[in-house]
């Protein structure tokens, strides 16, 4: 928990467009002189970047969580422009949360949140149901797998006699 692996390129696990540009985001904060969060010392500015993806719309919701220590000199407009440049129309929402909780895993609902651009949530669809996804949402990251699981569960629910399944 004390170290962070800097993402330099697409890991194949999430979103190539965003992952390939992570060095640009890191450079933005480094050039501005913003410090990274030091979990052991409970100090620093940049805590984490939470990203949610709607596979239905191919859009992203980005929430930057920082401490309040350097917030007065944080260039919100510059960060917003950078994220728009990186994601274009795929950026559905950009949020900035200031959280000074010294804990290792601060609750993202604590602190103050500002919408820098767009909306504070995404919409995702699974089996025709629509879900509102916020930065705090625990949601299946692979909707296609979730649809298969839901469909299988519904098959079991609507079987007349579960005992006769081959």
Report each predicted region and the residues it spans:
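Accessory RNA-recognition modules of RNA-modification enzymes
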Residues: 1-166
């Amino acid at each position: 928990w004390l170290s962070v692996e800097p993402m330099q390129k697409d890991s194949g696990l999430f979103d190539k467009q965003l992952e390939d540009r992570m060095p640009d985001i890191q450079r933005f904060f480094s050039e501005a002189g913003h410090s990274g969060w030091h979990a052991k010392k409970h100090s620093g500015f940049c805590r984490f970047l939470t990203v949610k993806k709607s596979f239905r719309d191919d859009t992203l919701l980005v929430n930057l969580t920082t401490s309040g220590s350097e917030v007065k000199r944080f260039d919100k407009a510059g960060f917003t422009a950078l994220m728009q440049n990186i994601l274009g129309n795929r950026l559905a929402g950009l949020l900035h949360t200031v959280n000074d909780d010294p804990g290792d895993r601060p609750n993202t609902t604590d602190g103050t949140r500002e919408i820098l651009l767009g909306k504070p949530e995404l919409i995702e669809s699974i089996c025709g149901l629509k879900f509102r996804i916020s930065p705090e949402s625990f949601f299946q990251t692979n909707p296609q797998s979730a649809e298969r699981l839901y469909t299988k569960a519904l098959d079991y629910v609507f079987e007349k006699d579960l005992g006769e399944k081959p």
